[in-house]
């Protein structure tokens, strides 16, 4: 669930209701600023993933630039890094970002798969984008960092990402909800899980 600064999708009351009534782990996406970090710390979900935000965007458009904003991030993230919440940061597949995340003391990254998904849709540079992800998940794993991935993943394009053994979690929301309008949520989740399981075995 993504509680945006502008509360465009859901707000903190929705988040509290979800945490109270859903008996599965919740992954909270928030911006890396003091207000949102306080919400994350108070609500205490199992996972918090820090993402960049732009008020004009329709959806998250890229990864957080940890290397460029390292000094500021190390300061604002300090309180939540001292909790028991599992922290990850949403980044583009880039070794400098991975190095910065390791220096920050964060043990998990979520790789932005949007460029791969766009390439897949256009049938252009798919191998190039996949190679970039593959090289970076291997680099992250070698540096002791857990690898998650997500953004733009669908029934058609998820297999190649799920087949990467270093990736231990995929975060897929928008597509499953969109598909569930026509096919039912349980059916959409089951179909996606079957594709992922088949690709990762």
Segments (PLM) and residue ranges:
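Catalytic cores of alpha/beta
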Residues: 34-43, 93-104, 149, 153-167
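Glycine-rich phosphate-binding active-site loops on the catalytic face of alpha/beta enzymes
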Residues: 49-57, 108-120, 166-185
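Histidine/lysine/aspartate-rich catalytic loop segments that bind and position anionic ligands
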Residues: 86-139
